[in-house]
């Protein structure tokens, strides 16, 4: 029987039984002593008769005395053999209970001690710094014979430059055992990006017709493309593959390698100091990437590979839009900045005068909280929206302050986020570009939907969460900043009520299917069904002229009721309970709903919220009934949710006893199906329009349920082609085994010079 020792804290003793359940058949010895030296730790292991030891306390730093900095989370999963004893550094074992992935990770890391034979063999890190062209040429010749090549760069912010690149060649043995792990070796080289000769040699390696491996390679490739060195045969990416396998886990290289390889130690803080240290650090990155990819090929399930084959092409299709960006209208930017500075300064002066403190800062949560307490609301503990909502409804003065804080922060956010100098790209020559760049990331969410953030080049902004337009007629829309190039129009094609339609077909709720497919306004139809008001009093489908010549225009006739139905539908789809719906809608809106619906005076706000949710459940009984039970059953039986396109999510949490997990998993199928459909359309638009109509079309970005693009004036056919490609039919099977074909319709807007001025093109 294998014996291992655990060095834990006294606070972790309550989780020991859970720990024992992860390693049946293993003798587990534990100590809460805190050894002061490595020798003392060795003695503890030998006294326990153990072959290995895991450490969850700060004493683990004794195992890595040369570490420049140390945190337990960074080194978790590191496995070291010291004086013939295997040591594993782990996080606090309470995470077995307190985090969804804690149980899985603890079992994985402990197996480095209990069953080392099941882990793939990690080849030695054979490394060379090629400081001269002759050394680089010799490395190039070796790499020509590699079966795969992993690469990684280190960048310098000031010049948008990379100063070193590493290559790890993977050489697979000719003779492999019938069973067992891949036999392979690696050779790692780093090339300084120091002059044109070295640049040419780097380019030659990248142009070798050998499959390439990266970790989050869009970042590396952005700089390589910038410096005229695009790689060929970029097929493999460890971040995308790990997301395809375990979407709920981190995608950092250090985490992935600790999870995938046994004999690995955290190295991400070893690149400080000399260029030699930086180069070796870069080499370890590409070596870790190569070895991790090989471990994936050895043990990853087929469904993870199927996911990868869906996700990775989307990443490739993101590169061109990221480098294309969107034109920035400098005049609109100036007006936007001027308007919001005026609002910001006016609100700050008004609030400061009201409290009698010239230096009062409404952007400081500490100062706001002090004022809230001074106004008698000492039970308010923070300045989050739900807390400020509670504060505001207690007195008209509170409401005035709360709305003032909100307006100040909104204007200040526009100034700091959208009109800052760093929005523009400043190139290595110091030139500023009137363009907005950004990143689009297919591995940013658990559902497969693209995320966004600032550009790889330290500029730009997150393009998906653009601030909504103000009601004030004088306000300048943030979207006015985003413009089409000369001779082009901007266009946007949007999947209409995509998540509601997805939920209807996935759940098999026939009432909801009828509602989304009948052709009437969905939210007005819901308002009628939820609250018993005739549809015709809420929405007018067609414009008409009566006998007296009076024109009745099409559109919404009762916005408050329609907006209320939208909030209730959103809350129910995301499985909110009364308290969360109250926080989401806000106290004031719930009070409005109470009087709008003539609900009893004696009802409290939570009862109003419960009533609102009950109206959804009565109208669509399957969504929060049989459908939720089906989702819980799938996870209980397989730990997976499989969508109509085959995209599979591994689920670590138990939705039966975890409300947060249940909410996440209930929302997943419709969000993921929407993402998969949008990604299919994205790939088609990229390959069939963007790459073919290069003079007349620009693919810009995914924006949640829509795709933003530019088309040359006179080429409206390309805009309609985008709309048609967005409409992807998918065969969906509901929990009752009934199959239906879902095709979400796509709306189209275009013919606008800016994003704010798009016109309906239906």
Range-by-range predicted roles:
Residues 158-159, 218-230, 243-245, 369-376, ...:
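Short active-site loop/helix that positions an aromatic residue
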Residues 149-151, 235-240, 482-499, 581:
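Conserved catalytic palm subdomain of right-hand nucleotidyl-transferase polymerases, strongest
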Residues 115-187, 259-260, 267, 274-474, ...:
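Conserved "right-hand" nucleotidyltransferase catalytic core of DNA-directed polymerases
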Residues 319, 323, 378, 437, ...:
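Conserved catalytic core of nucleic-acid polymerases
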Residues 1-119:
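A polyanion-binding, active-site-adjacent surface
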Residues 65-77, 82-87, 91-96, 103-106, ...:
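Metal-dependent phosphoesterase core characteristic of DEDDh/y 3'-5' exonuclease domains
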Residues 2-8, 12-30, 120-255, 259, ...:
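Conserved RNase H-like, two-metal-ion catalytic cores of nucleic-acid enzymes
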